[in-house]
């Protein structure tokens, strides 16, 4: 794996406690990413921090290392009840909360500090049993944390560290009232270490930092381009009739090792999933109403490689760290220009290259000007030969459509792709 995304700064130079370093090094982390190198010296000194960094820059490891380090170096000066965690880490989604928890386990093992997890959708009693035993660091979503707080399962009056991850996403999802409710139940900002991370430090995020933090230092990690220099962007203008066949043809030509296909609605995601599955791809579906256990299993399968393609709404566009994604397909151009950046940011991470392919169809092409204005450059356009799209595709039985795909010959972009009408064999299960 390329190390070009790392700095020459080592975690051992950051002033971290030996137990924290042991947890990092047990997972092979020795050198810092830019956000870690900039933020950890400030956090170790006890400064609050508001950091701007995209997902995949190493910010999770930065705030986890700082949290564990602070708790080790600042023992409580008064007795703590068993229902009083010492640190709280808030995330916008269940998947991100679970991911943070998993990333924290190595430092938990090396420091002896106990972790708790709280998120909605499932596992209330199981999570409750852990919390009732007492935890040092509580990681979770705001809604479930408030449920436990109102039930007096947890008490926030002894919080020493608070982390708010993906703050901009919290606003998007309408969780800011919950966040303010929780902040007001904690000790004042001058009596705790506070960290906020966000992909964008918008005015509303800065106001939140000003309101609930103690003169935070601002750290900003700007990509060389809004969309990342390692991501090859490509745009097609298909008709609505050609759109699905073009996606299938591109899948056949690119044959991605690991791809995410984004669509704007649940129903379109289900449609795309059915077509891809019917065409022999190993594909998973991730939308907002997929049951939690199934969501976690799909993400696990996708991460392990037993599923090659994930079809998703924007529920997966932010927060989740899914390594080694080679391709992102925007089947629908997003309505929010910022979501375009978050979507294609799933690839081209950790020093690797990636490929983003967007379809500007009749329904969503009008979103393109705002996207290109936001990213400060036009997306390169590729043409396709509609006579060269796949001609051996049939609609899946469970998808009801007014028209059937028109038989066409071959599938390439101006001469590329497989020759002699050969199809790749279906992916092996």
Curated annotation (Swiss-Prot):
<feature type="domain" description="Helicase C-terminal">
    <location>
        <begin position="243"/>
        <end position="390"/>
    </location>
</feature>
<keyword id="KW-0547">Nucleotide-binding</keyword>
<dbReference type="Pfam" id="PF00270">
    <property type="entry name" value="DEAD"/>
</dbReference>
<keyword id="KW-0963">Cytoplasm</keyword>
<keyword id="KW-0347">Helicase</keyword>
<dbReference type="InterPro" id="IPR027417">
    <property type="entry name" value="P-loop_NTPase"/>
</dbReference>
<keyword id="KW-0378">Hydrolase</keyword>
<feature type="short sequence motif" description="Q motif">
    <location>
        <begin position="9"/>
        <end position="37"/>
    </location>
</feature>
<dbReference type="InterPro" id="IPR023554">
    <property type="entry name" value="RNA_helicase_ATP-dep_RhlB"/>
</dbReference>
<dbReference type="GO" id="GO:0005524">
    <property type="term" value="F:ATP binding"/>
</dbReference>
<dbReference type="InterPro" id="IPR000629">
    <property type="entry name" value="RNA-helicase_DEAD-box_CS"/>
</dbReference>
<dbReference type="Pfam" id="PF00271">
    <property type="entry name" value="Helicase_C"/>
</dbReference>
<feature type="region of interest" description="Disordered">
    <location>
        <begin position="399"/>
        <end position="429"/>
    </location>
</feature>
<comment type="function">
    <text>DEAD-box RNA helicase involved in RNA degradation. Has RNA-dependent ATPase activity and unwinds double-stranded RNA.</text>
</comment>
<dbReference type="GO" id="GO:0003724">
    <property type="term" value="F:RNA helicase activity"/>
</dbReference>
<feature type="short sequence motif" description="DEAD box">
    <location>
        <begin position="165"/>
        <end position="168"/>
    </location>
</feature>
<comment type="similarity">
    <text>Belongs to the DEAD box helicase family. RhlB subfamily.</text>
</comment>
<dbReference type="InterPro" id="IPR011545">
    <property type="entry name" value="DEAD/DEAH_box_helicase_dom"/>
</dbReference>
<dbReference type="InterPro" id="IPR014014">
    <property type="entry name" value="RNA_helicase_DEAD_Q_motif"/>
</dbReference>
<keyword id="KW-0694">RNA-binding</keyword>
<feature type="domain" description="Helicase ATP-binding">
    <location>
        <begin position="40"/>
        <end position="219"/>
    </location>
</feature>
<dbReference type="GO" id="GO:0016887">
    <property type="term" value="F:ATP hydrolysis activity"/>
</dbReference>
<comment type="subunit">
    <text>Component of the RNA degradosome, which is a multiprotein complex involved in RNA processing and mRNA degradation.</text>
</comment>
<dbReference type="GO" id="GO:0005829">
    <property type="term" value="C:cytosol"/>
</dbReference>
<feature type="binding site">
    <location>
        <begin position="53"/>
        <end position="60"/>
    </location>
    <ligand>
        <name>ATP</name>
    </ligand>
</feature>
<dbReference type="InterPro" id="IPR050079">
    <property type="entry name" value="DEAD_box_RNA_helicase"/>
</dbReference>
<dbReference type="GO" id="GO:0006401">
    <property type="term" value="P:RNA catabolic process"/>
</dbReference>
<dbReference type="InterPro" id="IPR014001">
    <property type="entry name" value="Helicase_ATP-bd"/>
</dbReference>
<dbReference type="InterPro" id="IPR001650">
    <property type="entry name" value="Helicase_C-like"/>
</dbReference>
<protein>
    <recommendedName>
        <fullName>ATP-dependent RNA helicase RhlB</fullName>
        <ecNumber>3.6.4.13</ecNumber>
    </recommendedName>
</protein>
<keyword id="KW-0067">ATP-binding</keyword>
<dbReference type="GO" id="GO:0003723">
    <property type="term" value="F:RNA binding"/>
</dbReference>
């Amino acid at each position: 794996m390329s190390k070009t995304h790392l700095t020459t700064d080592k975690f051992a130079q950051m002033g971290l406690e030996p137990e924290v370093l042991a947890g990092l090094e047990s997972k092979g982390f020795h050198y810092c990413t830019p956000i870690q190198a900039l933020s950890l010296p400030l956090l170790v000194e006890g400064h609050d921090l508001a950091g701007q960094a995209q997902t995949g820059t190493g910010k999770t490891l930065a705030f986890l290392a700082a949290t564990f380090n602070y708790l080790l170096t600042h023992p409580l000066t008064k007795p703590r009840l068993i229902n009083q965690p010492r640190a709280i880490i808030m995330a916008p989604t269940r998947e991100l909360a679970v991911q943070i928890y998993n990333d924290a386990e190595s430092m938990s093992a090396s420091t002896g500090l106990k972790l708790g997890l709280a998120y909605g959708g499932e596992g209330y009693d199981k999570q409750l049993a852990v919390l009732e035993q007492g935890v040092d660091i509580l990681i979770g979503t705001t809604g479930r944390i408030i449920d436990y707080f109102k039930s007096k399962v947890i008490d926030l009056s002894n919080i020493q560290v608070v982390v708010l991850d993906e703050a901009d996403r919290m606003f998007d999802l309408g969780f800011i009232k919950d966040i303010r409710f929780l902040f007001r139940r904690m000790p004042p900002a001058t009596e705790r270490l506070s960290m906020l991370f966000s992909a964008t430090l918008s005015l509303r995020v800065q106001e939140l930092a000003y309101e609930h933090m103690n003169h935070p230092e601002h750290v900003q990690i700007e990509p060389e381009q809004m969309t990342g220099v390692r991501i090859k962007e490509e745009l097609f203008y298909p008709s609505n009739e050609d759109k699905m066949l073009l996606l299938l043809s591109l899948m056949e030509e690119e044959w991605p090792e690991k791809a995410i296909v984004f669509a704007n609605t649940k129903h379109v995601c289900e449609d795309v999933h059915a077509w891809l599955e019917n065409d022999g791809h190993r594909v998973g579906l991730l939308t907002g109403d997929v049951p939690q256990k199934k969501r976690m299993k799909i993400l696990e399968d996708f991460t392990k490689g037993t599923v090659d393609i994930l079809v998703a709404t924007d529920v997966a566009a932010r927060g989740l760290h899914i390594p080694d994604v080679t391709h992102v397909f925007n089947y629908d151009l997003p309505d929010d220009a910022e979501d375009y950046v978050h979507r294609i940011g799933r690839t081209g991470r950790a020093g690797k290259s990636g490929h983003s392919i967007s379809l500007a169809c009749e329904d969503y092409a009008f979103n393109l000007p705002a996207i290109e204005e936001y990213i400060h450059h036009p997306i390169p356009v590729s043409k396709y030969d509609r006579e060269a799209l796949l001609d051996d595709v049939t609609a899946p039985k469970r998808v009801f459509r007014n028209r059937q795909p028109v038989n066409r010959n071959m599938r390439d972009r101006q001469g590329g792709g497989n020759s002699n009408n050969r199809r790749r064999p279906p992916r092996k299960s």
